[in-house]
From Swiss-Prot:
Belongs to the RBOH (TC 5.B.1.3) family. It comes from Arabidopsis thaliana (Mouse-ear cress). The chain crosses the membrane at residues 352-372, 437-457, 493-513, 537-557, 566-583, 714-734. This is Respiratory burst oxidase homolog protein C. GO terms for molecular function: calcium ion binding; NAD(P)H oxidase H2O2-forming activity; peroxidase activity. Residues 390-549 form the Ferric oxidoreductase domain.
Length: 905
C-alpha cells in the first residue's frame, strides 16, 4: 500500500512517501531524479510554497490494478466519493476531470516504480521479452551521440531548412524518411534512418514522412546539448520496440560499446562482470530484465553525484576570487609595460641576473678586443672587420668554456645539496642555460667567420704593396693572392672543420631531430632523427675542442704564447668535465647492481627493480643514468627514480620512445614471461637465482643527480603534476611524504610513551610538507598499471589523507557527457561495493577528460591562503606554459604564492 500527497489545483507536486505499510506493499524505493519538463512522473521541490489544499491518497497496487483505499483532505477531513473516484477504484481511470488526470498519472508512476523494485505481493511471472534489437542498435546510438555533440545550433538549422526546401520542392513540403539524413547533413544513411525512427517513436509518428514543423522539432532534440536529452535519444535508439526493458546481454553490449567508445579495453574485457553488477543492483529478484528507466535513474544519479557541492561561504569565497582573477586592462601602455616587467622580474630574477651578467662579460671581452685591434698595425688595411672578428672570437672562447659547466651534473648536484647557492643561482635551468650559450656560440662563430671571409681577407688581398708592407710580420713577405692561401693554412683548416662538426652536432641536437619528430625523412635518414644520433654527434665536440686549441695557437696576428689565451679559457672547464666522466665510469663499475624484477606494462613501459648499492643516498625527485651494454656500451640515459629513499631497492620506469629504449625493451622481453593471474603487467621476470642469474643483461647506474622536484620538502603544500610517464618523479615523492609522515607520527608516539616533550620546530627543518595534491594525467587506461601497487599502498597507508590523489584518463569523455555516463555509473557502483576504481584498478577514483587547471589552482588558493605552494611538473612541454602562467596569475592576485618548477633532463 502506498501513500501519495498532492495538491488539488495548480501544477501538481508530489511528496511521494513509499513505505512498507502492509504485507502487500512494495519495497523501499530509491529516490528518483528527473529534470523539470520530463513527461514522466516528476518529483519537484517540496519546499516550494503551496497555496492549494492537500489530498492524502492511499492506494493498493496489485499487478495491473490500482484501487483507492482512502482519500482525505488536508487536516484529516474525508473527501466525498465522486463518480470519477468510483471509476478509479474500478481501475477504469477515465480522465474526465483535472483531479482524475493527476490520479491517473500517479497510478501509472506507482506501477512503474513497483516494477523497478521487483513488484508487490504475488508477483506476476515476467513476460517474454519482446526485444528485437540488433547488436548494431547500441553501436549506432553511441555513434549518434558523437554526431549530436557536434551540431551547431541555430546556425545549423538555417542550412537544414535550406536543404529541406530544396528536397521537398517536388513533394509538397513533406520530407521522406529516406531523405532525412541528407536533409540534416548526416553522412551515415543507416544511422539517419535509426535516428529518424527513434525520434518518430517518441512522438508517435507512424508514417514515412514528416513536415517542416516536425523536422524542426526533431532538430531541436538533436541539437539539445543537455545530458538528459542526449541520454534520452541514446536510449530511444537502443529500445527499438519502446517496451523499456533491457536484458543482461543488452546491458553487457552497452557496457562493451561504451568502453570501446572511450578506449577502455580493460572494462571491455570485464563487461560480463559489470553487467552482472548492474543486474544485481537493478534486478535483485532475478526477473531477467531491468527497466530502461531504472538504468536511466542510476545514470542520472551518477551524473549528479559528480557535481561537488559547496557551502554558501565557500561559494561566496569562490565567486570573490573569480572576480579578482578576471583580467584587468589598463589603458595606459606605460603602466601596462611597467606592471608586466615588474611581475616578470619578480618571478625570474634568478635567471635575469645570470643572463645579464653573461651579457656584460661578453660585452666587456668584445669591447676589449675591439679596442686592442683598432690600435694594432693591421687596422689601416683590414679596418673594423678585423676588430669585429677578434671581438667575436673572444666571446666564442668564453662560451666554449662556459657551455661545459651546466652539464657537470655531479658538481651541480653537490652545489645545490651542500651550499646555499641554490637560493640565487637557478640550478634547475642548467640545460636551458646550456642551450642559450650554444646560441651565443653560433652567433659568435658566424660573426667571426663572416668578418674574416667577407671583409678583412678581401681587403688584405686587394691592398697595395705599400699598405701591405707593415703586415709582412704577420702574413709573410709575399702578399696573399687568393682565398686558398688562408684555407690551406692551419687556421683555415681547423676553422672550417670546427664549423662543419659544430653544424652537425647543433642540428642533430634540435628537438626535431633529438626527439624523432621528423617522420617524413626517407628511410636511411630516419636514423638521424633519434636520441642516438644526438648522443654520438655530441661527442664530436671532443675533436672540436682539440681543433679549437690548435686554431687558437696558430694565429696570424699573435705571436707571444702568453697572448694566446684559448687554452686559458678552456683548461678548468675541460678538466672538470673530464673528471665528471671519469667519476661516472669509476662509480658505475664499483657500485654494482643486480636486477631483482622486470615488468613490461601496457603503453610500452618497462619497469626495472635493482638492488640498492651501499652508500647510494638519494632524495625523492632525483634521477640517475642507466647503461645497458647489451644495447650500447657507450650510451647513458637519465631516468627518474621511482622508489622512495626508505626502500631497499632502486626502481625506474622507462617509456619506450626512441631506438635505445626500444632495444632495451627487446632485450628484457626475451627473459620475461606472461605473469600469473591477478598480477599486473604484460610480461614479468623476477630474480630467483641470486646475483649470478645469467638471463638478465648487465645494467650499470650512475647517480643520483639533483632535480627540481627534490626541493618539494621546502614547501608545506605541494602540487605534483605528472603527464604520462612524467609521473615517475612524483611517485617517489608521494611515497616519501607518506613515509616521512609515518616516521613523524611514530616519533611522536615514542615521545608520549617516554614522557618527553616535543622538540621545538626548527626553521631549518628538512621536511615541512603537510599537504600534497597529486594529479596524474594519462591518455590510456593501461597506463594506470605502471604504479597500481604504489597507488594502493599510498591510499592504504595515508590514514590522515595528507595526500589527495587524482587520476585523469583523457581517453574517456568528460563527466556529464552521455558517452561516458554509463562508465561513470559503473565506477560509482563498483567503488561503493568493492572499493576499487574500474578505470585505474586502484583505490583512487579516476576522473575523465582533462583537468581544469584553473579550478585546481583556485581550490588550492582557497584552502591554503597566505601559504607558499610548490608546483612541480614533469611531462610534455605543451602544458608547461599554462601551469606556469596560472602559478604567476594566482600568485599576483591572491595571498597564496605558487612557485613553479619543471623537470629538465
Amino acid at each position: 500500500m502506498s501513500r501519495v500527497s498532492f495538491e488539488v489545483s495548480g501544477g501538481y507536486h508530489s511528496d511521494a512517501e513509499a513505505g512498507n505499510s502492509g504485507p502487500m506493499s512494495g519495497g523501499q524505493l530509491p529516490p528518483i531524479y528527473k529534470k523539470p519538463g520530463n513527461s514522466r512522473f516528476t518529483a519537484e521541490n517540496s519546499q516550494r510554497t503551496r497555496t492549494a489544499p492537500y489530498v492524502d491518497l492511499t492506494v493498493d497496487v496489485q499487478d495491473d490494478t490500482v484501487s483507492v483505499h482512502s482519500l482525505k483532505m488536508e487536516g484529516g477531513s474525508s473527501v466525498e466519493e465522486s463518480p470519477e473516484l468510483t471509476l478509479l477504484k474500478r481501475n477504469r481511470l477515465e480522465k474526465k476531470t483535472t483531479v482524475v488526470k493527476r490520479l491517473a498519472s500517479v497510478s501509472h508512476e506507482l506501477k512503474r516504480l513497483t516494477s523497478v523494485s521487483g513488484g508487490i505481493g504475488g508477483r506476476k511471472p515476467p513476460r517474454p521479452a519482446k526485444l528485437d534489437r540488433t547488436k548494431s542498435a547500441a553501436s549506432q546510438a553511441l555513434k549518434g551521440l558523437k554526431f549530436i555533440s557536434k551540431t551547431d545550433g541555430g546556425a545549423g538549422w538555417s542550412a537544414v531548412e535550406k536543404r529541406f526546401n530544396q528536397i521537398t520542392a517536388t513533394t509538397g513540403g513533406l520530407l521522406l524518411r529516406t531523405k532525412f539524413g541528407e536533409c540534416i547533413g548526416m553522412t551515415s544513411k543507416d544511422f539517419a534512418l535509426e535516428l529518424f525512427d527513434a525520434l518518430a517513436r517518441r512522438r508517435n509518428i507512424t508514417g514515412e514522412v514528416i513536415d517542416g514543423d516536425q523536422l524542426k522539432e526533431f532538430w531541436e532534440q538533436i541539437n539539445d546539448q543537455s545530458f538528459d536529452s542526449r541520454l534520452k535519444t541514446f536510449f530511444d535508439m537502443v529500445d527499438k520496440d519502446a517496451d523499456g526493458r533491457l536484458t543482461e546481454d543488452e546491458v553487457r553490449e552497452i557496457i562493451s560499446l561504451s568502453a570501446s567508445a572511450n578506449n577502455l579495453s580493460t572494462i571491455q574485457k570485464r563487461a560480463d562482470e559489470y553487467a552482472a553488477l548492474i543486474m544485481e543492483e537493478l534486478d535483485p529478484d532475478n526477473i531477467g530484465y531491468i527497466m530502461l528507466e531504472s538504468l536511466e535513474t542510476l545514470l542520472l544519479q551518477a551524473a549528479t553525484q559528480s557535481v561537488i557541492t559547496s557551502t554558501g561561504e565557500r561559494k561566496n569565497l569562490s565567486h570573490m576570487m573569480s572576480q579578482r582573477l578576471k583580467p584587468t586592462f589598463n589603458r595606459n601602455p606605460l603602466k601596462r609595460w611597467y606592471r608586466g616587467l615588474r611581475f616578470f622580474l619578480l618571478d625570474n630574477w634568478q635567471r635575469c641576473w645570470v643572463i645579464v651578467l653573461w651579457f656584460i662579460v661578453m660585452a666587456i671581452l668584445f669591447t676589449y678586443k675591439y679596442i686592442q685591434y683598432r690600435r694594432s698595425p693591421v687596422y689601416p688595411v683590414m679596418g673594423d672587420c678585423v676588430c669585429m672578428a677578434k671581438g667575436a672570437a673572444e666571446t666564442v672562447k668564453l662560451n666554449m668554456a662556459l657551455i661545459l659547466l651546466p652539464v657537470c651534473r655531479n658538481t651541480i648536484t653537490w652545489l645545490r645539496n651542500k651550499t646555499r647557492l641554490g637560493r640565487v643561482v637557478p640550478f634547475d635551468d642548467n640545460l636551458n642555460f646550456h642551450k642559450v650559450i650554444a646560441v651565443g656560440i653560433i652567433v659568435g662563430v658566424t660573426m667571426h667567420a663572416g668578418a674574416h671571409l667577407a671583409c678583412d681577407f678581401p681587403r688584405l688581398l686587394h691592398a697595395t704593396p705599400e699598405a701591405y708592407r707593415p703586415l709582412r710580420q704577420f702574413f709573410g713577405d709575399e702578399q696573399p693572392k687568393s682565398y686558398w692561401h688562408f684555407v690551406n693554412s692551419v687556421e683555415g683548416i681547423t676553422g672550417l672543420v670546427m664549423v662543419l662538426l659544430m653544424a652537425i652536432a647543433f642540428t642533430l641536437a634540435t628537438p626535431w631531430f633529438r626527439r624523432g619528430k621528423l617522420n617524413y625523412l626517407p628511410g636511411p635518414l630516419k636514423k638521424l632523427a633519434s636520441f642516438n644520433a644526438f648522443w654520438y654527434t655530441h661527442h664530436l665536440f671532443v675533436i672540436v675542442y682539440i681543433l679549437l686549441v690548435a686554431h687558437g695557437y696558430y694565429l696570424y696576428l699573435t705571436r707571444d704564447w702568453h697572448n694566446k689565451t684559448t687554452w686559458m679559457y678552456l683548461v678548468v672547464p675541460v678538466v672538470l668535465y673530464a673528471c665528471e666522466r671519469l667519476i661516472r665510469a669509476f662509480r658505475s663499475s664499483i657500485k654494482a647492481v643486480t636486477i631483482r624484477k622486470v615488468a613490461v606494462y601496457p603503453g610500452n613501459v618497462l619497469a626495472i627493480h635493482l638492488s640498492r648499492p651501499q652508500n647510494f643516498k638519494y632524495k625523492s625527485g632525483q634521477y640517475m643514468f642507466v647503461n645497458c651494454a647489451a644495447v650500447s656500451p657507450f650510451e647513458w640515459h637519465p631516468f627518474s627514480i621511482t622508489s622512495a629513499p626508505q626502500d631497499d631497492y632502486l626502481s625506474v620506469h622507462i617509456r619506450v620512445l626512441g631506438d635505445w629504449t626500444r632495444a632495451l625493451k627487446g632485450v628484457f622481453s626475451e627473459v620475461c614471461k606472461p605473469p600469473p593471474a591477478g598480477v599486473s603487467g604484460l610480461l614479468r621476470a623476477d630474480m630467483l637465482h641470486g646475483a649470478n642469474n645469467p638471463d638478465f643483461p648487465k645494467v650499470l647506474i650512475d647517480g643520483p643527480y639533483g632535480a627540481p622536484a627534490q626541493d618539494y620538502k621546502k614547501y608545506e603544500v605541494v602540487l605534483l603534476v605528472g603527464l604520462g610517464i612524467g609521473a615517475t618523479p612524483m611517485i617517489s615523492i608521494v611515497k616519501d611524504i607518506v613515509n616521512n609522515i609515518k616516521a613523524k607520527e611514530q616519533a611522536q608516539l615514542n615521545r608520549m610513551e617516554n614522557g618527553t616533550s616535543e622538540p621545538q620546530r626548527s626553521k631549518k627543518e628538512s621536511f615541512r610538507t603537510r599537504r600534497a595534491y597529486f594529479y596524474w594525467v594519462t591518455r590510456e587506461q593501461g597506463s594506470f598499471d605502471w604504479f597500481k601497487n604504489i597507488m594502493n599502498e599510498v591510499a592504504e597507508r595515508d590514514a590522515n589523507r595528507v595526500i589527495e590523489m587524482h587520476n585523469y584518463c583523457t581517453s574517456v569523455y568528460e563527466e556529464g557527457d552521455a558517452r561516458s555516463a554509463l562508465i561513470h555509473m559503473l565506477q560509482s557502483l563498483n567503488h561503493a561495493k568493492n572499493g576499487v576504481d574500474i578505470v585505474s584498478g586502484t583505490r583512487v577514483m579516476s576522473h575523465f577528460a582533462k583537468p581544469n587547471w584553473r579550478n585546481v589552482y583556485k581550490r588550492i588558493a582557497m584552502d591554503h591562503p597566505n601559504t607558499k605552494v610548490g608546483v612541480f611538473y614533469c611531462g610534455a612541454p605543451a602544458l608547461t606554459k599554462e601551469l606556469r602562467h596560472l602559478a604567476l596569475d594566482f600568485t599576483h592576485k591572491t595571498s597564496t604564492r605558487f612557485s613553479f618548477h619543471k623537470e629538465n633532463f
